[in-house]
Amino acid sequence: MDEYKIVITPDAEADLNELDEYISFHLMAPDTAIRCIRYIRSKIAGLRKTPKRYSLIEDEPWHSRGIRRMNAKNFAVFFYVYEKYNEVYVQNIIYQKRDLPGILSERYADLDESD
């Protein structure tokens, strides 16, 4: 079985940086931030072998675009699998207690417009 290449998009990197800053400076817990980021990255690395074990998001327009969700403790990792090149694109990493549908609608607004 081939492994998938993991591509972390600039948006996902920005999410990780925002998370790091929030935990490090707002919560004053830099060691916790390091552990949290490492954990999320290790979960993302696990997508190399079986990314399709995670379900597609049921709601549109994300479902028809192949967007999947993986939970990493208190965070939702959104990604899609690009079979043609055996790649997994990590799109966003969002704290699960936030308004996920609202945030996704904002971040993926261009998906609705492209139809």
Across the structure, where does each feature detected by a protein language model lie?
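Enriched for short, Lys/Arg-rich terminal
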Residues: 27, 72-76, 80-115
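Basic, Lys/Arg-enriched alpha-helical interface segments
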Residues: 1-64, 109-115
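Basic side chains
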Residues: 43, 53, 68-69, 92, ...
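Basic/aromatic recognition patch in beta-strand/loop cores that engages polyanionic ligands
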Residues: 50-87
